Amino acid sequence: MNSVNKLLEKSFKSNWDRPAISNYRGATITYGQLSYNIVATHIMFEKCGIKPGDKISICSKNQANWGVAFLASLTYGAVPVPILNEFKSGTIHHLVNHSNSRLLYVGEAIWENLSPSEMPEVEAIAQMENFSVLYAKDSELKRDRLNIDAIMQERYGDSFGPDSLCFYEDSPEELALINYTSGTSGFSKGVMIPYRALYSNIKFGSYAMPSLNNRSRVVS
C-alpha cells in the first residue's frame, strides 16, 4: 500500500475508539469523531465545488482543528497550503493568491485583518476555531454548514462507522501539499511536496522510532 491517504484510512479504522487529537488542556476526540469531522468537511468541500488538486490554505495558531482541516484537505485529494499565522495580512493575501487557493481556514484573530476582496479566487473562508463560515460567494454555504449534522444524518443515517470511510487514493508523484518558507529574504517561496515524500517520512519514522505506537502521545 503506497497511498498515504489509504494508510491514514486504515489507521483510523483500526483505532476508531482510541484518542486521536487534543487541544492542550482541552477536549480530546477519538479517531471515530475525527473521521466524522473529516467526512463532514468533505461534504462542505463538495458544496463549494472543490475538486482533487484544488488548493486549500490553512492559517491559524496550533490547535486540534488545524489537524482536522489539514487531514480533511489531504484525504479529499485537495492540496493543503499551511501558512504561518505570524505573517502580516498582506503576506497572507499574497500567499493565498500565489497558491491559487480556493478555500481558506483562518484563526479568529487573523481574520480581523484580512479582506476577501484581496483574495478574489477564494470561494469561502472558514473560522478555524469552530469551522463557521465567515465568507462565501455562495450564500447557501452558511446554511449548509449550520445544517451539516442533518446532512450527515441524511447521507449516513445512524450507521456512520469505519466502513463509511473511503479516502482519496493518491499516487506517489502527485502533489500532496505546498509548504511556504518563512520568507527571510522577500516573499516566501512555495515548496511543492509530492506524496512520495510524505510516504517516505512515514516509513522512515516507523523504522527510526520503533517505540512509537498507537498509545504514544506526541506534542505538535
Annotate the PLM regions.
Residues K55, K61-V81, N85-S89, N97-L103, ...:
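A short helix-loop-beta submotif of the ANL/AMP-binding
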Residues T30-G32, F167-Y168, A176-K203:
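Conserved AMP-binding A3 loop
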